[in-house]
């Protein structure tokens, strides 16, 4: 039996896209993006000696743009897939997820599913996940229990059920209640420069949520300055233009992630985003220096 491992971030992304949508359609559809697992992967986990026939790991989703009568907007879908490939070149489209908002007769649901799958035969989808949200879930486990996975046979038919495994993606931080590594301003070096230092949260009585919100605001301000720089940069060479588009897309993805709000691993995620933004800032400064040398 096949095993499909889910990142909890992928489930969160599905819920976020669903809640932020104003569509009143009965079904929302998502492409499942991921990779195949083998024993060399860090996230490979043996299954009590009974290895599954095939193991895959879902780490991202792409919302499928739908039109009336369950028609897929193929042009917009292709654009979303290509945009994802800009930053994740080795992605594999593994399957499709049906988020159902109404309790329907199974025969009707299967007909809708077959109609959608018929339009996606070119993607050679392997799996179908059904996610029922017509009942309000009060816990993560209840949401997990409402997901059922199946093989897709002959491109459009629902086959045998598969095993779903959900990874919590938890990050272990020592002394999480006592000490955090946070950026603090150091005006003696540079008014816009932040240095990292360990702060004792109990002694300083720093409000974590307030700090997180303030940090995100600072990051968004830095991102905005980079966007203005890239848009105003006078470059006629094609290599720069193509690279500029890639960086702008990356910045757009960062902004989207930051605007989603706090998570249980906010400090870990913020550190990653800070590092990504610093790398983008370095790239911008390199272009600026290169342009000055050409003059």
Swiss-Prot record:
Localization per Swiss-Prot or TrEMBL: Cytoplasm; Nucleus
Keyword set, alphabetical order: Cytoplasm, Nucleus, Signalosome
Domain of life: Eukaryota
Keyword Manganese attached: no
Coiled coil feature spans: none
Subunit comment: Component of a COP9 signalosome-like (CSN) complex, composed of RRI1/CSN5, CSN9, RRI2/CSN10, PCI8/CSN11, CSN12 and CSI1. In the complex, it probably interacts directly with CSN9 and CSN12. Interacts also with RPN5.
One cellular component (GO) term of this entry: cytoplasm
Function, in words: Component of the COP9 signalosome (CSN) complex that acts as an regulator of the ubiquitin (Ubl) conjugation pathway by mediating the deneddylation of the cullin subunit of SCF-type E3 ubiquitin-protein ligase complexes The CSN complex is involved in the regulation of the mating pheromone response.
Protein name per Swiss-Prot or TrEMBL: Cop9 signalosome-interactor 1
Keyword DNA damage carried by entry: no
GO biological process: adaptation of signaling pathway by response to pheromone involved in conjugation with cellular fusion; cellular response to pheromone; conjugation with cellular fusion; protein deneddylation; regulation of protein neddylation
Primary gene name: CSI1
């Amino acid at each position: 039996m096949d095993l499909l491992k889910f990142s909890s971030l992928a489930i969160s992304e599905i819920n976020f896209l669903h809640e932020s949508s104003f569509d009143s359609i009965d079904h929302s559809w998502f492409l499942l993006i991921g990779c195949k697992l083998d024993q060399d992967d860090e996230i490979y986990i043996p299954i009590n000696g009974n290895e599954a026939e095939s193991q895959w790991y879902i780490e991202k989703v792409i919302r499928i743009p739908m039109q009336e009568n369950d028609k897929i907007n193929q042009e917009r879908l292709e654009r979303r897939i290509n945009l994802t490939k800009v930053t994740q070149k080795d992605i594999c489209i593994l399957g499709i997820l049906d988020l159902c908002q109404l309790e329907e007769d199974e025969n009707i649901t299967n007909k809708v599913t077959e109609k959608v799958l018929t339009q996606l035969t070119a993607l050679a989808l392997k799996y179908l996940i059904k996610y029922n949200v017509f009942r309000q879930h009060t816990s993560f486990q209840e949401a997990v229990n409402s997901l059922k996975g199946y093989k897709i046979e002959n491109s459009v038919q629902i086959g045998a059920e598969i095993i779903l495994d959900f990874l919590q993606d938890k990050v272990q931080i020592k002394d999480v209640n006592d000490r955090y590594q946070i950026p603090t301003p150091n005006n003696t070096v540079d008014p816009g420069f932040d240095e990292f230092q360990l702060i004792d949260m109990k002694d300083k009585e720093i409000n974590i949520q307030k700090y997180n919100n303030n940090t995100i605001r600072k990051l968004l301000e830095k991102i905005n300055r980079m966007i203005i720089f890239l848009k105003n940069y006078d470059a006629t060479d094609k290599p720069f233009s193509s690279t500029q588009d890639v960086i702008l897309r990356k910045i757009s993805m960062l902004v989207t992630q930051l605007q989603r709000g706090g998570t249980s691993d906010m400090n870990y995620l913020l550190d990653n985003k800070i590092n990504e933004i610093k790398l983008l800032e370095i790239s911008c400064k390199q272009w600026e220096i290169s342009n000055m040398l050409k003059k």
